Amino acid sequence: MDKLYAAIFGVFMGSPEDDLTDFIEIVKSVLSDEKTVTSTNNTGCWGWYWLIIIFFIVLILLLLIYLYLKVVW
């Protein structure tokens, strides 16, 4: 375990303290099979999915309106 901590410390020598602490907590949870570590990188992901879906729906609707008006006129 000491070798693991030494290797982790060597990798994160130039990065902020929070990155090292988060990584050590993740490694500890993996080694002990705990499910206590939560990801903070995925906070606004659902908002982006909805925005992309709405964008494509609007794009398809505009295409259908254009084709309809092209046929009618």
From Swiss-Prot:
Which UniProt keyword terms apply here? Late protein, Membrane, Transmembrane, Transmembrane helix, Viral penetration into host cytoplasm, Virion, Virus entry into host cell
Please give, as recorded in its UniProt entry, the membrane topology of this protein.
Single-pass membrane protein
Q: Which GO terms describe its cellular component?
A: membrane; virion membrane
Localization, per the record, is: Virion membrane
* One Pfam family matching this protein: Pox_EPC_I2-L1
Q: Which domain of life is it from?
A: Viruses
Q: Does the keyword Membrane apply?
A: yes
Report TM segments: 49-69
In which broad location class does this protein mainly occur, judging by the first location in its UniProt entry?
virion
- The disulfide bonds in this chain are none
Q: Which InterPro entries match?
A: Poxvirus_I2 (IPR009175)
* Example GO biological process: symbiont entry into host cell
**Induction or repression:** Expressed in the late phase of the viral replicative cycle.
Q: Report whether Transport shows up as a keyword of the record.
A: no
Function description:
Late protein which probably plays a role in virus entry into the host cell.
Which family would the database say this protein is a member of?
Belongs to the orthopoxvirus OPG078 family.
This protein is called: Protein OPG078
Gene label: OPG078
